[in-house]
Structures are given as C-alpha cells and as structure tokens.
From Swiss-Prot:
Molecular function per GO: structural constituent of ribosome
Native source species: Methylorubrum populi (strain ATCC BAA-705 / NCIMB 13946 / BJ001) (Methylobacterium populi)
Domain of life: Bacteria
GO annotation, cellular component aspect: cytosolic large ribosomal subunit
Protein name from the UniProt record: Large ribosomal subunit protein bL28
InterPro entries: Ribosomal_bL28, Ribosomal_bL28/bL31-like_sf, Ribosomal_bL28_bact-type, Ribosomal_bL28_sf
Length: 101
C-alpha cells in the first residue's frame, strides 16, 4: 500500500531538518493519511478510500464525494477513484436522460 492520497495525489516528500547551527539531517515528510468510508449519493453506496485529512476537508467543501470527483482532474486520482468517477458520471447521465424525455 503506497503512502499516496487516492483523491489528491499527495505523497511522501523528502527534505531536511535544519538545526540552529544549520546542520541538515535528511527527513521524510509523510502525508496525514486516513482510511475513510465515504457515501456516494449518485451510486447510492459507500466507498472505502485512503485519503489525506486535506482531501477530506476538500470533499466536504465541494459538497460530497460525487461533486469532488466530477471536478477532479484524472491525473491526480488513483485507479480506484478514476473508475468511481466514470461510474458516477455514467449514473448521472442515465438519470438526466429520462427526465428530459
């Protein structure tokens, strides 16, 4: 399991811890990952994802998982999230078509 957010693509960063005397020590900065279950309103089911705390706030800000995935860029998403995005877009298209007829 990689240390990468499935929704935003945030991953491990490498840098230095710098002391007062300016000595540098290599350090890994890990993302704040959480295992969460999010509700998809369009698919009417729950989805388990491994996301950062920052991504959770973004999902809430955009109005839920469906709205977040529709606006998200494909490059940042994991394979699971890409498949989920396609399923949501198909379901929304299906529900919009009969209403127009």
């Amino acid at each position: 399991m990689s240390r990468r957010c499935e929704l935003t693509g945030k991953a491990v960063q490498v840098g230095h811890l710098v002391s007062h005397s300016n000595r540098k020590t290599k350090c890994r900065f890990l993302p704040n990952l959480c295992n969460v279950t999010l509700q998809s309103d369009a698919l009417n089911r729950r989805v388990r994802l491994r996301v950062t705390a920052h991504a959770l706030r973004s999902v809430e800000h955009r109005g839920g998982l469906d709205a977040f995935l529709i606006k998200a860029r494909e490059i940042e998403l994991s394979q699971t999230a890409r498949l989920l995005k396609r399923d949501i877009e198909k379901k929304i298209a299906e529900t919009a078509t009969p209403a127009a007829a």
